[in-house]
UniProtKB/Swiss-Prot annotation:
Residues 1-32, 61-127, 140-198, 349-378, 392-496, 557-594, 629-661, 945-994, 1029-1063, 1605-1631, 1649-1675, 1777-1995 are annotated as: Disordered. Residues 1-28, 82-91, 153-169, 407-416, 429-442, 1033-1045, 1804-1825, 1852-1870 have a biased composition (Basic and acidic residues). Interacts with dil1. The modification Phosphoserine is found at residue 790. One of its GO terms (cellular component) is endoplasmic reticulum exit site. The lineage of its organism: Eukaryota, Fungi, Dikarya, Ascomycota, Taphrinomycotina. Residues 140-152 have a biased composition (Acidic residues). Keywords: Autophagy, Endoplasmic reticulum, ER-Golgi transport, Membrane, Phosphoprotein, Protein transport, Transport. CDD domains: ACE1-Sec16-like. This is COPII coat assembly protein sec16. It is a peripheral membrane protein. Residues 561-574, 1899-1915 have a biased composition (Low complexity). It is found in: Endoplasmic reticulum membrane.
Length: 1995
């Protein structure tokens, strides 16, 4: 028993050495074997137990009887060995197990002063009768033992062995409880003993013994007490010493002494006490009867809140002559362990059968089992014996064998069919023969084997029968032979055993359903009946003994054999294996045992019906029994309790029926403990082997009841609790001189005293919740004692105590009274995540003055302000010693030095560790430890904790504050902290991911800066000019020498010290600036002569490098050298680029071939590129490991690489797990071969984790639920099930109603039962989402997918304290389980991540859906480029290039997983062009060429299906391709290019020299190019598409308001010089390769009526890209035109809103005035807002002014139909003739008929001539073939003679237009005989040009350009994509354009025109015939059908 006090128990000085032999002889004389071990007391260290004589056992105070139902508590005051006034002995927890309704009672007992009792007190006659079955728990104090009162061996006599239980007025007795009050247990005839009934409303009922004067007589019996001490040291030695006869009620203290004579300490080792109690008699039951007859008075009720002793007293109805008493003393020490001392007192029995003494050791954790039957023994309570508190329950359980006689018929009916409501004690204890103890399950009790001994205390046969009846043994068990060997067991699940034959027979019948009625009679009489077996005993006994063939079962309650077993380790039997991943223990299937595989049994209830029914009955009994205690909520405990705490007794695979309260731990462990020793460091979260703090007595705190199973978090409400209440067994490490262990801060001698004891060995509790501590060591500290009066402030710490471990991290369970050391941000993150209560106290963080590598602590006190100190190099690979510093590794804090009076700064969010510059190193470098060890750093101010810049010096920092460091001025100004310094690996020192020993780095102090030079005065320093000292060099004229000295002083490192591998980067301090003149002339010359890039030109990476040439120069100082411009050299840019552009060369894109399919090497190249990219990101994370964006990007790249490597959808889940969840381990699968025991009774595998939902299903619920269903009301049944939280029934009913109801019930279940607070961060939300997704709920309807929930609450960026860390778990959960709404769930999750600006993470979620639709430029797409938000329209150049490459990789991924057609991102084509341009500029011509090939082939495919091709984009691709081909002419072949394949003309420069001119013509153009008639179709594949030349009519007057708005304007395909204008001030829109879009107002603005010589021709609506007509390039200067701010074209997307709106009222009259009035022009301009009128109403007779159309121009077919007035400009016919001239007159004039006949005759003649030419050419071709074949080059060079002839054109006048001249009729008639005179002519096509007046001319009318829009329409801006503007009406008096001044001469002055006459009508047919163009005279150019691609073919 544990006695906790502030003083150590006084040990007796009696030496046992001299009395050893004599006592052993006395034992041998009495025929007592000292090795006979009947009772074993296994003790643990530092716990004291005493066994007092019986006369003082009930001597003091039997009171405090309290019960709520049937539990009694008795306080027993016992004498103390060292009485002290005012000392309160802390009582121990006493728990007793009652099989009836057991409640939890937490009274407290106050044990007052005790004094030695005299013999007069012991002679009182007040005796108390204690019947058999009484269970008493007490606390026995140590009696006073004086040296004079110690008895000698001669004083020991049998008469003194008489012990009496004395009573006085203070004595009290508790109410007793009948042990077996159930009717199922047969009770032999015996006097009835009534129970003492107490009111349950009274919490504490005290029944004093003063009301009764009953005596309990004890007969005079002699007893020999054999005490054997087993001292289990580290070597497991066992020392046996003889026991001592206790005389006169005393025992002497025993000190063990080994053979070597060294005294052993009991507090560090386990001591086992073996006693053999003798018979002890307790007199008659009269006193008990009288005691029970007395009523309970309320006057005797006391309230004692300090009682902690619980005594349960249960008496069974046994015969009075056979009654026995058993005292259970349950002790629960500070470790939470339970110890029980059992003393059995019985009346002596003269005739008893032989019993085999077996010492059964019961685990202290099994306290819920009822008290097993014990044999009758007599115990002599003699002298108290000081022993260690036992850690195991000691029971003298002899394997009682019942008599071989059959019981009488009266006692045969021991079992009934009624299922009892309470459990019975264990059924039997089998006899075991002599076996080797090494084979037992508990070899640790004794290292020597147990020898068989003779039974000294045989039982009486009648008592045997009584035991059998009380225990409910089967009547057939007596028939078992005595030779049956069975291991003794107290396990209730193993209390019943049968033979193998019986087991096999019964099980064979049960499992095969072959239990026939006719076979029942054949079962032998000894066969155990199934109904008898399945009774109140646990059903697991049937499974263990019947269904498993193994006869020898290991005991679950015995610890496994180990070399050094832990004192309180959780006990697991050998047949139970621990599943570490799953955290549950499972029973291993026995060999040959019956198992039910999943293939055979889909459910446990598919087993034989007999087994299932019995199991259901048994489980129902267990639930009814345990439901009584369900009102006590189970405390919220960690999922894995701390290892230092013993597991709850209900956990150890015990049957639930044997567990009083398996739900509530408070019943078993809720009674307050004795106040344990409190240590200053409270809860130690480090491994037990790493720290050994000092143990200090705790200050008793009243009124607090600690919860053993709550986490050790010392919150404000629990700050008074005893901190260390548990102990654990660890491997003790003795501290050596250099030993360093982890330990947190503790208050020390500043306030609590200066004397601190040396550290000693002690066990340190461990917790499974504690973070894994680093293996590195720290300095051992001496923790102080916490005083309740101490203020809760930062304690004063000495320097030695402030040195912190490098490997330790701050505990998350530090109490509030203790101020911890400053924690890093990483530790804050860990603490916030691991603390259950999220306890975050504001840590006093401060920044150290420097990192450890800037100074040496050993030289830390002596400082100089004038001359800086240069410390020696520090090798960090050395072992860190106390007092020295160490380089911190990842997640660690640097060594911190404090002064006694230092006050930490305010808390900072991020406490970074930095490396100072050389200036700080010189400031703090000279530090000596001569005085610092004693006084600390008292001379360092608070400003020293911040980095300091040196004083003002232009060589260091131009803007630094002015200060001085000379003598007398020691002020230093703090500035912002410096960034971390880089080591040789480029990684900051505080973020090393590897051990510092592997990267040995040395740092040297810098040289003396000029500002620390003592020769520099203060005035000079304040002036900001650092001049060299006069003492450096007396020669003032030597500039080189002076500059050299100054440069050397200003250098950051001295010349004699080695430089690091990498310079210091990322420093705020500027490097010293040396003078311009350097002393090193050679280096200067080398620098000046180095080549430098001069300029770069072209898109293909051509760069010009310039060189400097030195030349002699004579100056006043002598000869010098000057550099002049030297030669230049043209090189490739890719050859001179630095490593910064290596990513341009590494990317081997595009990964798609030119045909759009995946390239065969693309996949391997992409994986290689991703691998290099991932390595670069990992290096970047070493610099900044908190960059969330980089981490998300790294995950994205890893997933892309994985998707390319796997290429199989089925393997994605498996390969994705290590990327998203690297630390996750898959739990072991469920056991496929589950035993029947586990299937039917799963309670045996219950865990100790917190219960989230516990609801029992009652019979009333089932009846009412069934009634609802019987009435057909499923809704009411569902509602009732939801109200009662019967989720299985509710979910089943909801599933039968509809899908929405089912989803709602599942959602309700998740909200109610899945407690987020009980689970790890993020698990609750993810589990809720998973369950709802399984119910086919829509992801967008879940409230968990909301930014307001804890799923993505990113207000706090701390990852550990936020549930955002679980988004990867949720992502993997969605992908791994393949939910039906998986894509929608991924979309919603990605949207939430985008809301929090987690772009890479969101895109990763989208990509894992493997749907190409997520990436496009459509409005409903999720993103357009990987890593770029869809709304981010302005990325940088580097970001755009990077995201384009990532998107290309994604395109390749989708192609790999595409099952049908290839995936091609059309929106990526413009970005690919940008990428090609960047690569071409960098010199990567081949990569750029691949992109151009891919884009060109895509455009060729698209142009065949759609006409929505941007001409500007086409020009950019064409120009870039041509330039790439020209730059790669020596190595590339144009025929392999997409551009070469579209051009029919091959490369001819390498064939024949005669073809050089042809090649020049191909490159430079046609030398015969007609400037007056330029070809509108240029070379190239897109010549016909972009054939319109630029409209360069433009002046230098620009509209600032519309500067940024451009219109979609195609440009010409001809040379760029053709589009240039010689006008000064004009803007050329086609000066470069590609011209941007032109402003929509540039066409119409600045164009006056005078200069409207080149009007704008809009495109048609059907084809917005209709080629437009060209105009003269040498146009004259145009006059100004008023600016128009508005337009009636409202749908022009390239115009601002103001330009497409009508003018408001009051805007001024200038907008509505005619143009001629504003500018003084006589012509009046029509208003653009007048109603629409016919074109003839306002258009003048304009002369043709446009350039002639090319007859070979390509005209699409969709513009052939006549254009209406709303679609195109008015035709020349409408301009030339009025509308009435269109009326055809049937009476044609003769002149018109003659003209038509002449035209037809000409056509016929031309056809005949053409036929003749064809025949002639055919003959020539035949003669050429006969002469010999020629090559294909000759065909190219051959000129066709027919081409020189004029081309004959056929006119199709209609279907019936074949005319012939009828001589009779003398006119032309049709072949079908139709009369032409009576037919109306078809509507003619619009003529090209028709002047109104002018003399006839022979020039063809085809030379006239088409008429443009009217003058009023010139102000309207045209758009290729919009319909043509509506022509505006004007007056007839408009001035003709030809009459305007400054108009260019008309090119149609010689055109043939019909005679002008206003008096006659013009025949339209005559106009048509006259408009026929003559044969062209232009030189033929040959076939051009293969020179271009008809992109408008299908349009």
């Amino acid at each position: 028993m544990d006695i906790e006090s502030d003083h150590e128990p006084k040990e007796s000085s009696v030496d046992l050495e001299g009395r050893h032999d004599s006592i052993r002889k006395s034992f041998e004389a009495d025929d007592i074997d000292v090795t006979d071990e009947n009772t074993i007391f296994s003790t643990s260290r530092k716990e004291q137990s005493t066994i007092e004589p019986m006369d003082s056992f009930v001597e003091n105070n039997i009171a405090n009887s309290s019960s709520q139902q049937s539990v009694s508590e008795i306080d027993i005051q016992l004498p103390s060995s060292e009485p002290k006034e005012g000392v309160k002995e802390e009582s121990n927890l006493i728990e007793s197990n009652s099989l009836d309704n057991v409640q939890e009672i937490n009274p407290q007992n106050t044990i007052g002063d005790k004094s030695a009792h005299t013999e007069e007190e012991s002679s009182n006659d007040n005796l108390v009768k204690i019947t058999a079955g009484t269970i008493i728990s007490d606390i026995m104090d140590e009696p006073v033992v004086d040296e004079d009162d110690k008895l000698s061996e001669e004083d020991l006599s049998k008469e003194d062995l008489e012990t009496t239980l004395k009573g006085d007025e203070n004595y009290s007795s508790s109410q007793k409880e009948i042990y077996d009050n159930d009717e199922t247990i047969p009770k032999p005839p015996s006097p009835e003993v009534e129970k003492i009934e107490t009111s349950t409303s009274v919490e504490n009922a005290y029944i004093t013994n003063s009301q009764y004067n009953d005596t309990l007589d004890m007969e005079d019996q002699t007893s020999d007490l054999i005490t054997t001490f087993e001292h289990e040291n580290e070597d497991h030695e066992v020392h046996e010493v003889p026991s001592i006869h206790g005389m006169e009620g005393t025992f002497e203290t025993v000190n063990l002494t080994s053979e070597a004579g060294n005294e052993k300490e009991f507090n560090n080792d386990s001591v086992v006490l073996n006693t053999t109690p003798k018979e002890m008699q307790i007199s008659s039951l009269d006193a008990v009867d009288k005691l029970e007859d007395k009523p309970v008075s309320n006057d005797n009720i006391k309230a004692n809140i300090e009682s902690s002793t619980t005594v349960d007293r249960a008496s069974s109805q046994l015969e009075s002559e056979n009654n026995e008493s058993t005292f259970f003393v349950h002790n629960q020490n500070s470790s939470g362990q339970h110890q029980t001392l059992d003393f059995v007192a019985s009346k002596p029995v003269t005739d008893t059968p032989e019993l085999s003494k077996e010492n059964t050791l019961v685990s202290s954790e099994n306290l819920n089992d009822p008290k097993p039957n014990l044999p009758e023994t007599e115990v002599d309570f003699g002298e108290p014996l000081e022993v260690e508190a036992p850690s195991f329950v000691v029971q003298n359980n002899s394997a009682v064998q019942p008599t071989t006689q059959k019981t009488s018929e009266d006692s045969t009916d021991l079992h009934t069919n009624e299922i009892p409501n309470v459990a019975q004690p264990p059924s039997s204890f089998e006899k075991e023969n002599n076996k080797d103890t090494s084979k037992l399950e508990n070899p640790d009790i004794s290292s020597s084997p147990l020898s068989p001994t003779e039974d000294l205390f045989p039982n009486d046969p009648e008592e045997e029968n009584l035991f059998s009846a009380a225990l409910g043994l089967n009547s057939n068990t007596g028939s078992q032979p005595s030779e049956t060997q069975s291991k003794p067991s107290i396990d209730p699940s193993e209390s019943i055993t049968v033979t193998d034959n019986q087991d096999s027979l019964l099980f064979s019948q049960l499992t095969n359903n072959a239990l026939q009625a006719e076979n029942a009679t054949k079962v032998s009489e000894n066969t155990i009946n199934d109904e008898e077996l399945i009774d109140d005993s646990e059903f697991t006994s049937l499974m263990s003994n019947f269904l498993e063939s193994s006869t020898v079962q290991t005991n679950k309650y015995l610890p496994k054999s180990s070399a050094s077993p832990p004192a309180n380790a959780p006990i697991v039997s050998s047949d139970v294996h621990k599943n570490e991943n799953a955290g549950t223990a499972r029973r291993a299937p026995q060999s040959g045992a019956f198992v039910a595989s999943k293939a055979k049994y889909s459910s446990p209830y598919d087993l034989p019906e007999e087994i299932v029914q019995v199991a259901q009955q048994k489980r129902s009994v267990s639930q009814n029994y345990n439901r009584q205690y369900s009102f006590q909520p189970r405390p919220a405990t960690p999922s894995n309790p701390p290892r230092s705490l013993p597991p709850p007794s209900g956990q150890v695979n015990a049957p639930m029926s044997q567990t009083p309260n398996p739900i509530s731990f408070a019943y078993q462990h809720g009674t307050p403990l004795a106040t344990p020793t409190m240590r200053a460091n409270s809860f130690n979260s480090y491994p037990a082997s790493s720290a050994e703090p000092i143990r200090r007595p705790a200050t008793t705190t009243v009124g607090h009841t600690p919860n053993l199973y709550s986490p050790k978090t010392n919150t404000y409400n629990s700050r008074h609790m005893a901190y260390e209440m548990t102990k654990s067994h660890i491997n003790v490490i003795s501290p050596g001189p250099s030993l360093q262990v982890n330990a947190p801060y503790t208050p020390t001698s500043g306030e609590l005293g200066n004397k601190v004891s040396n550290p000693t060995k002690e066990f340190v509790s461990t917790s499974s919740y504690a973070p894994a501590a680093n293996t590195r060591n720290a300095i051992i500290r001496e923790p102080g004692i916490l005083s309740p009066l101490s203020p809760r402030v930062q304690p004063v710490l000495s320097r030695r105590e402030s040195i912190i471990s490098m490997g330790s991290s701050a505990s998350s369970y530090v109490p509030l009274e203790i101020a911890p050391r400053p924690m890093s941000s990483l530790e804050h993150t860990m603490n916030s995540a691991m603390s259950p209560g999220n306890l975050q106290r504001t840590a006093n963080l401060y920044k150290p003055m420097t990192t450890p590598n800037a100074y040496n602590i050993k030289n830390s006190n002596q400082r100089e302000t004038k001359y800086p100190y240069q410390p020696q190099a520090i090798n960090y690979s050395e072992v860190t010693q106390p007092g020295s510093s160490s380089l911190p590794t990842s997640g660690e804090e640097a060594n911190i030095i404090r002064s006694p009076g230092f006050t930490p700064l305010a808390a900072q969010k991020d406490a970074t560790i930095y490396t100072p510059s050389h200036a700080q190193a010189t400031l703090y470098g000279n530090m000596d430890n001569n005085d610092r060890d004693n006084e600390g750093i008292h001379d360092i101010l608070q400003s020293d904790m911040e980095p300091v810049l040196p004083p003002h010096n232009s060589a260091y920092h131009a803007n630094a504050p002015v200060s001085s460091h000379s003598e007398g001025l020691n002020n230093r100004l703090p500035i912002s902290p410096l960034p971390p310094q880089l080591h040789k690996t480029g990684t900051p020192s505080h973020q090393h991911g590897f051990d510092t020993a592997e990267t040995t780095a040395k740092q040297y102090a810098p040289s003396i800066p000029p500002n620390f030079n003592p020769n520099v005065s203060i005035d000079t320093m304040t002036e900001g000019v650092a001049l060299p000292s006069a003492t450096l060099d007396s020669d003032k004229s030597s500039l080189h020498k002076r500059s050299a000295e100054l440069s050397r002083n200003n250098s950051p490192r001295p010349d004699f010290l080695p430089l690091p591998n990498q310079p210091l980067l990322h420093s705020n301090l500027h490097s010293p600036v040396s003078p311009v003149v350097d002393s090193n002339e050679d280096s200067r010359l080398k620098f000046l002569s180095t080549q430098r890039p001069a300029f770069s030109f072209g898109p293909c990476g051509t760069i010009v490098m310039a060189f400097s040439t030195p030349s002699g120069l004579y100056t006043t100082s002598g000869k010098g050298t000057k550099f002049i411009a030297g030669p230049i050299k043209i090189e490739k840019l890719g050859d001179v680029l630095t490593d910064e552009y290596r990513h341009l060369k590494e990317f081997k894109g595009p990964y798609l071939a030119s045909n759009g399919k995946v390239d065969k090497h693309g996949k391997a190249e992409a994986i290689e590129w991703l691998s290099k990219y991932i390595d670069r990101l990992n290096q970047s994370l070493e610099y900044d490991d908190k960059n969330i964006t980089l981490k998300d990007k790294l995950l994205l790249l890893q997933c892309l690489k994985m998707l390319l490597e796997v290429s199989d959808r089925k393997l994605i889940v498996e390969k994705l797990r290590p990327i998203l969840l690297p630390s996750f381990e898959i739990p072991e699968p469920c056991n496929t071969a589950t035993s029947v025991q586990e299937l039917i009774n799963p309670e045996i595998n219950q865990d100790d984790s917190p219960i989230v939902a516990s609801r029992y299903c009652t019979t009333s619920f089932l009846h009412r639920f069934y009634e609802y269903l019987l009435s057909g009301n499923k809704d009411e049944a569902l509602t009732y099930a939801l109200q009662q939280k019967q989720w299985p029934y509710a979910i089943i009913v909801a599933h039968s109603i509809d899908a929405k109801t089912f989803q709602g019930v599942v959602r309700t279940f998740c909200k109610s039962e899945v407690k987020e607070s009980m689970l790890r961060s993020g698990v609750g939300v993810n589990l809720q989402l998973s369950l709802q997704l399984m119910s086919d709920a829509h992801a967008s309807s879940m409230s968990e997918f909301s930014s307001s929930t804890s799923l993505l609450n990113l207000a706090d960026q701390s990852q550990a304290s936020n549930a955002l860390v679980a988004w990867k778990e949720l992502l993997y959960n969605i992908i791994a389980n393949h939910y039906s709404d998986q894509k929608e769930a991924l979309r919603v999750l990605g949207t939430l991540l985008l809301q929090e600006n987690r772009v890479y993470a969101a895109h990763l979620v989208y990509i894992l859906s493997l749907s190409p639709d997520v990436c496009s430029n459509k409005s409903n797409s999720l993103f357009e480029l990987v890593g770029l938000s869809k709304h981010n329209l302005y990325p940088s150049h580097d970001d755009l290039f990077d995201v384009t490459q990532l998107t290309e990789v994604l395109e390749l991924v989708f192609n790999v997983y595409s099952e049908k057609t290839p995936v091609f991102f059309t929106h990526l084509v413009p970005y690919r062009l940008y990428e090609a341009e960047v690569l071409a500029e960098a010199g990567e011509v081949s990569a750029a060429r691949k992109y151009c090939e891919l884009i060109g082939n895509y455009l060729n495919r698209v142009a065949k299906k759609s006409n929505n091709v941007d001409p500007g984009f086409v020009l950019r691709v064409r120009d870039l391709t041509q330039q790439i081909l020209e730059n790669s002419a020596g190595s590339e072949d144009i025929s392999s290019s997409w551009l070469g394949r579209t051009v029919s003309r091959p490369r001819l420069d390498t064939v024949l020299s005669s073809l050089g001119s042809k090649f020049s013509k191909f490159v430079a153009g046609d030398p015969n190019f007609d400037v007056m008639r330029p070809a509108t179709v240029g070379p190239g594949p897109f010549g016909k598409v972009a054939s319109q030349k630029n409209l360069t009519v433009q002046t230098n007057t620009n509209n600032a308001a519309m500067e940024s708005f451009y219109s979609d304007r195609p440009t010409s395909s001809g040379p760029s010089y053709q589009n240039r204008t010689p006008l000064t001030g004009q803007e050329s829109m086609n000066m470069g390769v590609y011209s941007p879009y032109r402003r929509s107002t540039e066409i119409a603005e600045n164009m006056s009526m005078d200069g409207n010589a080149y009007p704008y021709t809009p495109a048609s609506q059907e084809n917005p890209y209709t080629p437009r007509h060209s105009q003269e390039d040498n146009a004259s200067v145009l006059s100004q035109q008023p600016l128009t701010f508005y337009s009636n074209v409202a749908d022009n997307s390239y115009m601002p809103v103001s330009a497409s709106q009508e003018p408001k009222m009051g805007m001024g009259t200038a907008f509505n005035m005619p143009t001629n009035e504003v500018h003084g022009v006589g012509a009046e301009m029509a208003s653009p807002y007048q109603p629409l009128q016919p074109a003839s109403a306002h258009l003048p007779n304009l002369q043709p002014t446009l350039a002639p159309i090319n007859q070979n121009a390509y005209v699409p077919s969709n513009i052939a139909p006549a254009m209406g007035a709303m679609q195109s400009a008015p035709s020349a016919e409408a301009v030339a003739a009025p509308s009435e001239s269109l009326n055809l007159n049937k009476d044609r004039s003769q002149q018109a008929k003659q003209a038509a006949a002449q035209n037809v005759a000409d056509l016929v003649r031309q056809e005949e001539e053409k036929e003749k030419q064809k025949q002639k050419a055919k003959k020539n071709a035949e003669s050429g073939k006969k002469g010999g074949a020629k090559g294909w080059f000759s065909k190219l060079l051959r000129r066709d003679e027919s081409k020189d002839q004029p081309t004959v054109y056929k006119a199709k006048l209609g279907e019936k237009s074949h005319l012939h001249y009828d001589k009779e009729l003398k006119r032309w008639v049709n072949d079908d005989g139709s009369d032409l005179s009576n037919q109306a002519a078809p509507p003619p096509p619009p003529p090209m040009a028709l002047p109104k007046a002018g003399p006839p001319s022979a020039a063809p009318t085809s030379a006239l350009p088409p008429a443009g829009p009217p003058a009023g329409a010139t102000a309207i801006s045209g758009n290729p994509g919009m319909p043509a503007p509506v022509p505006l009406t004007g007056k007839e008096t408009a001035v003709p354009l030809s009459s305007m001044p400054n108009a260019p001469p008309s090119v149609a002055s010689n055109a043939k025109l019909p005679p002008a006459s206003n008096n006659r009508k013009v025949d339209p047919l005559e106009d048509i015939l006259q408009a026929m163009p003559p044969p062209t005279t232009r030189k033929a150019r040959g076939k051009t059908s293969k020179r271009y691609v008809d992109v408008m073919r299908n349009s």
